[in-house]
Structures are given as structure tokens and as C-alpha cells.
């Protein structure tokens, strides 16, 4: 497969995800396919965003690392010290992605590291490992292209997260401001009763304890549900199941007390 064909295969994957979050596991699988390598896509803090490994590489330590979805802190720091592409790293180097304890299997292995950059900052690292064959110039071109594309996707996700947080904050603020004084008081007591982000509420019990009518509680919950801040489900005589949908809601509720 030519370099152009391999590049197009990566582009095709990204076009499938246009407008939605990219699955970095899919990206890792595609990179692995077109470069015939073991692949790790790692965040700047060492979280494994995506990976694709052949069975030969999966020793006990690697399997544990994949289950934790995190590489060791020491290796994360070593990767972050790499400022530009380093290619064809041998197994005796601390930067190798292959387990040194299996030197008999991976004595001829090669690791290549591509820093992932975007928006003027380091976002993570693309690590490729090959059991026997050196990385060619075409491999390096493709790897650097893949790292650039991954960087753009990470930036896009971060931007989307910031936008979503802003929308959530506005929705929470509007919902709280729409509550009357008695409804606001009712909501405070409701979440004190729940003691967390979800739980079972018996409205009459709270109403009797606080000295408000049940209708005030119902109206307050309805306003929050309409704003998308919570979801509720009646369980009949057992009460009402309530779940917070906006993570920052309880923090904001605590702030305005």
C-alpha cells in the first residue's frame, strides 16, 4: 500500500466521525493496520486514549496497564521529555514500548515516538512499536501526519467540552433563578436528604420535616427537570427517584446557600 493510500485510509476514518467525537481506539487500529505496528495513543498525563497491540506484546505487565488504561508515571514523564520525533529506538533504551524483561522476544524491536502537539501545547504522545523491522521514512511521514490529526481531534474535543460546560452552567443558573424562595429552600432540603447525585425521595416526608407543602416540592422538581438539570421517575408508593444530570449543579447549589 502506498503512502498516499495509507494517508487516505486515515482520512476516511476521520470523515466517518465528522461532527461526533472520534474513538481513539478506532484511530489506533487504523494506524496499526497501515503501519503494521503496535500502537499507543497517550494523553499528556499518561492516560491511554487508544491502543492496538498484537498478542505477542501482551505480557502480564502490559495487560495490567491496558486494564488500568494508564501507563506508568515514570514512562509518561520520559515520553513528555521527547520534544520531537525519535525513531527506531532499541529495547535497551528507557523509551522502548516493549517489555525489557522479554529481551529474548523483542531484542530486534524498534520503537518510534511522535509528540502530539496542538494550539501551541503538548497534548500527548503517539507511540509505535515494531517487533523486527526498522521504521522507514514513509513510516515517519505517516506517523507525524497521524500525530497531527490526533492533536486536532484532541483540541476539538477540549473545545467541545468547554462549550458544553458553558451551556451546562447557563442551564443551571437559569433553573436556580427560576425557583421561588420556598422552592429554592425545598431543593436545598431535597438534596440534603438525598446526600448525593441520585437517590429516592419521599416528598411528603421532606414536606413534613421542613414545613412546606408537597406541591412546592413538585413544582421545584418540575422546573429543574424542564431545564435538563435533573431527571425524575415516580416509583409510586416508594417515592420518586431523582438523578442529577448536570455535574456542577450541586456545587452551584452549595455556593448559593
From Swiss-Prot:
Residues 203-222 bind DNA. Keywords: Cytoplasm, DNA-binding, Repressor, Transcription, Transcription regulation. One of its GO terms (molecular function) is GTP binding. Residues 1-155 are annotated as: GAF domain. InterPro entries: CodY (IPR014154), GAF-like_dom_sf (IPR029016), GTP_trans_reg_CodY_C (IPR013198), Transc_reg_CodY_N (IPR010312), WH-like_DNA-bd_sf (IPR036388), WH_DNA-bd_sf (IPR036390). GO terms for cellular component: cytoplasm. Gene3D superfamilies: 3.30.450.40, Winged helix-like DNA-binding domain superfamily/Winged helix DNA-binding domain (1.10.10.10). Pfam families: CodY, HTH_CodY. It comes from the Bacteria. GO terms for biological process: negative regulation of DNA-templated transcription. Belongs to the CodY family. HAMAP family: HTH_type_CodY. This is Global transcriptional regulator CodY. It comes from Staphylococcus saprophyticus subsp. saprophyticus (strain ATCC 15305 / DSM 20229 / NCIMB 8711 / NCTC 7292 / S-41).
